[in-house]
Amino acid sequence: MKNILTLLFVLFGGYSLHAQDTCYGFLRNDTLTIGNNLVERTFLWNGGNIITYRLTDKSNGKSWKNHSLTPDFRVTKNLPQPSNGSLKVVPVKETKIFPAYLKVEVSFSLEKLDIKRVYRIYDDCPAIACDTYLRGTVNSIFGGREVSAADR
């Protein structure tokens, strides 16, 4: 009986091992596109400091175009030019705790500040998660001030 249950679980539970069938992320020319069967986000690459161009809800066919050319990550009014922009698209297998997803990592630098934005795209989910990681210093970005803004 135990062997039969194990066999049934492997046969019918195997579908969840391929949970990224509808998820995608790719950079073509200067446009980054990420999404799944329900939602799609399109960005202008901008050296890695991406700018949202369009958000599309595929379930109802509605699309919202962003008319601003401001980068999605902004720490000050006068941003330096981004450098070292890179993209990594990695399928992540499911675990006992988390379902499978597609991880899209966008990394770039603003002078001495390194920024990594990690988008998580799940099958059949009408939302795209985003985590932002920072490393380095921002003194040069804020005009070379040595005093922390929190200490004022």
What are these regions (language model features)?
Residues 20-85, 91-151:
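Beta-strand-rich N-terminal accessory domains
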